[in-house]
Amino acid sequence: MTSYIYHYQWHGRAGSSVPLIVWPHGGPHSVITTDFKTIVMFFCQLGYGVLYVNYRGSLGFGEDNVRSLLGRVGDQDVQDCHEATLAALDNLPQLARDKVVLMGGSHGGFLVTHLTGQFPDLYKAAVAINPVTNLASLAGVSDIPDWSFNEAGLKYKYLHPTPENLATMWDKSPIKHIENIKAPILLLIGKKDLRVNPTQGYEFYHSLKALGKTVEMNVYEDNHPIGKFEHALDWKINSALFLNKHLRL
């Protein structure tokens, strides 16, 4: 597989390094483009590098690429994000290997929570915005109930999933790896989210709490993107404060 890293010219001091935010997109069948993004500029102004990842399954690389992810979520996409992180760290010495954190929403939140559980020693903190944490419990409460089936590689059942279906979904979910998590996690949840029901965040929060993990949760009177101006401003500022605190910046 051939992959590429596009990055801006380094303008920092020689020999210095910056913390890295790894930010997988949602969807999963969407794409990150190189257009101007205020959220990236916000974190860059705070001294972070930002790595966006178009993992296999993203749009713009052909139908076979899109379909390659079906049945492989929680594995192929997670591995791609992790490999992209390692490639960036190996090729860009201005990135601090001991200060790698995660951000992502929806399926990006699915990947963020997966990465903290599958690679607990690399990622030091994570912010998950309306994350999918359990495909099995999401199947009955999302406004797109076929999503959990299709992404798990299953045929959509109009009536109800079988126990075997639910076991397959759970096996591909971040909650499977929750006991391995070491990184502090901030969950940002929209109470009116119809796409990823807020119970996904609540379930993960209470499970982390029960395990004695470090977790915080902010809940907003908002929907899937948490896009109302006052709410978006709040979660961005709180995300920065959370990451700074746990990286001791």
What are these regions (language model features)?
Residues 55-249:
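Active-site-proximal cap/loop segments of hydrolase catalytic domains
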